[in-house]
Amino acid sequence: MACGLVASNLNLKPGECLRVRGELAADAKSFVLNLGKDSNNLCLHFNPRFNAHGDANTIVCNSKDDGTWGAEQREVAFPFQPGSVVEVCISFNQADLTVKLPDGHEFKFPNRLNMEAINYMSADGDFKIKCVAFE
């Protein structure tokens, strides 16, 4: 995957939400949204996989602590279609992150690193970001 958008100094605090809207490639295989302190310390690695790394139509989430990946969490809800415009909302709380998918389905991912703020975001893969909002 080519290097996509990287943003730092976000200072997203518990109770706040990150809303990302973008367009999926017509031949999308996967895309990634990372949130955390930096590229080696991620409280959320959000990776919808259409057909990548042995997974099909699966969302894989993980965390990375000082460069070491944690245990993967897989979600069976997969409301993404290649070539479509999608919006994902991620609410940050002290205990977990709540991910709201385009179809309204929500799931939680634990804040394993006990981060008190999210300062880093990156996006990569078959996803062209159109809008990022902080609420």
From Swiss-Prot:
<feature type="modified residue" description="N6-succinyllysine; alternate">
    <location>
        <position position="108"/>
    </location>
</feature>
<keyword id="KW-0597">Phosphoprotein</keyword>
<comment type="subunit">
    <text>Homodimer. Binds LGALS3BP. Interacts with CD2, CD3, CD4, CD6, CD7, CD43, ALCAM and CD45. Interacts with laminin (via poly-N-acetyllactosamine). Interacts with SUSD2. Interacts with cargo receptor TMED10; the interaction mediates the translocation from the cytoplasm into the ERGIC (endoplasmic reticulum-Golgi intermediate compartment) and thereby secretion.</text>
</comment>
<keyword id="KW-0430">Lectin</keyword>
<protein>
    <recommendedName>
        <fullName>Galectin-1</fullName>
    </recommendedName>
</protein>
<dbReference type="InterPro" id="IPR001079">
    <property type="entry name" value="Galectin_CRD"/>
</dbReference>
<keyword id="KW-0348">Hemagglutinin</keyword>
<keyword id="KW-0053">Apoptosis</keyword>
<feature type="modified residue" description="N6-acetyllysine">
    <location>
        <position position="29"/>
    </location>
</feature>
<dbReference type="InterPro" id="IPR044156">
    <property type="entry name" value="Galectin-like"/>
</dbReference>
<dbReference type="GO" id="GO:0006915">
    <property type="term" value="P:apoptotic process"/>
</dbReference>
<feature type="binding site">
    <location>
        <position position="62"/>
    </location>
    <ligand>
        <name>a beta-D-galactoside</name>
    </ligand>
</feature>
<feature type="domain" description="Galectin">
    <location>
        <begin position="4"/>
        <end position="135"/>
    </location>
</feature>
<feature type="modified residue" description="N6-acetyllysine; alternate">
    <location>
        <position position="108"/>
    </location>
</feature>
<dbReference type="InterPro" id="IPR013320">
    <property type="entry name" value="ConA-like_dom_sf"/>
</dbReference>
<feature type="modified residue" description="N-acetylalanine">
    <location>
        <position position="2"/>
    </location>
</feature>
<dbReference type="GO" id="GO:0005737">
    <property type="term" value="C:cytoplasm"/>
</dbReference>
<dbReference type="GO" id="GO:0030395">
    <property type="term" value="F:lactose binding"/>
</dbReference>
<feature type="modified residue" description="N6-acetyllysine">
    <location>
        <position position="128"/>
    </location>
</feature>
<feature type="binding site">
    <location>
        <position position="53"/>
    </location>
    <ligand>
        <name>a beta-D-galactoside</name>
    </ligand>
</feature>
<feature type="binding site">
    <location>
        <begin position="69"/>
        <end position="72"/>
    </location>
    <ligand>
        <name>a beta-D-galactoside</name>
    </ligand>
</feature>
<feature type="binding site">
    <location>
        <begin position="45"/>
        <end position="49"/>
    </location>
    <ligand>
        <name>a beta-D-galactoside</name>
    </ligand>
</feature>
<dbReference type="Pfam" id="PF00337">
    <property type="entry name" value="Gal-bind_lectin"/>
</dbReference>
<keyword id="KW-0272">Extracellular matrix</keyword>
<keyword id="KW-0007">Acetylation</keyword>
<keyword id="KW-0964">Secreted</keyword>
<dbReference type="GO" id="GO:0043236">
    <property type="term" value="F:laminin binding"/>
</dbReference>
<keyword id="KW-0963">Cytoplasm</keyword>
<dbReference type="GO" id="GO:0005615">
    <property type="term" value="C:extracellular space"/>
</dbReference>
<feature type="modified residue" description="Phosphoserine">
    <location>
        <position position="30"/>
    </location>
</feature>
<comment type="function">
    <text>Lectin that binds beta-galactoside and a wide array of complex carbohydrates. Plays a role in regulating apoptosis, cell proliferation and cell differentiation. Inhibits CD45 protein phosphatase activity and therefore the dephosphorylation of Lyn kinase. Strong inducer of T-cell apoptosis. Has hemagglutinating activity towards human erythrocytes.</text>
</comment>
<feature type="modified residue" description="N6-acetyllysine">
    <location>
        <position position="13"/>
    </location>
</feature>
